[in-house]
């Protein structure tokens, strides 16, 4: 029963086919891993940019807080001055009325 093809050749062809399938699977996994690595690097870059933006925002918030505190203090003193002026004017008017009524 000779078919013209040695029996060892059939085994080698099957082995080559399995080897090729395995190589294709390895290539597919390598491609997937390359895509994953690219995504990780891209994500790292975006996180780094986000961290920089967060730092800048924090610095801006600190500066705003300082400016707001200074402004609050400034207008508190202005308010105190206005109250002092108003009370002084009222006292002067009362003194004038008392002096005018007594004379």
From Swiss-Prot:
InterPro entries: Synaptobrevin-like, Synaptobrevin/VAMP, V_SNARE_CC. CDD domains: R-SNARE_VAMP2. Keywords: Coiled coil, Endosome, Isopeptide bond, Membrane, Protein transport, Synapse, Synaptosome, Transmembrane, Transmembrane helix, Transport, Ubl conjugation. GO terms for cellular component: apical plasma membrane; cell surface; clathrin-coated vesicle; clathrin-coated vesicle membrane; cytoplasmic vesicle; cytosol; early endosome; early endosome membrane. Residues 1-81 are cytoplasmic. Gene3D superfamilies: 1.20.5.110. Ubiquitous. It comes from the Eukaryota. Residues 103 are vesicular. It is found in: Early endosome membrane; Recycling endosome membrane; Synapse, Synaptosome. The keyword Nucleotidyltransferase does not apply. Ubiquitinated by RNF167 at Lys-70, Lys-72 and Lys-81, regulating the recycling endosome pathway. GO terms for biological process: calcium-ion regulated exocytosis; cellular response to type II interferon; establishment of localization in cell; Golgi to plasma membrane protein transport; negative regulation of secretion by cell; positive regulation of receptor recycling; protein-containing complex assembly; retrograde transport, endosome to Golgi. SUPFAM superfamilies: SNARE fusion complex. Pfam families: Synaptobrevin. Belongs to the synaptobrevin family. This is Vesicle-associated membrane protein 3. It comes from Rattus norvegicus. The lineage of its organism: Eukaryota, Metazoa, Chordata, Craniata, Vertebrata.
């Amino acid at each position: 029963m000779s078919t013209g093809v040695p029996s060892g050749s059939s085994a080698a062809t099957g082995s080559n086919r399995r080897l090729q399938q395995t190589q294709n699977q390895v290539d597919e996994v390598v491609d997937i891993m390359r895509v994953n690595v690219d995504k990780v690097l891209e994500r790292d870059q975006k996180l780094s940019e986000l961290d920089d933006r967060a730092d800048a925002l924090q610095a801006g918030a600190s500066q705003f807080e300082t400016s707001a505190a200074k402004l609050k203090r400034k207008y508190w003193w202005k308010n105190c001055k206005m109250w002092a002026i108003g009370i002084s004017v009222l006292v002067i008017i009362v003194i004038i009325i008392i002096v005018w009524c007594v004379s």
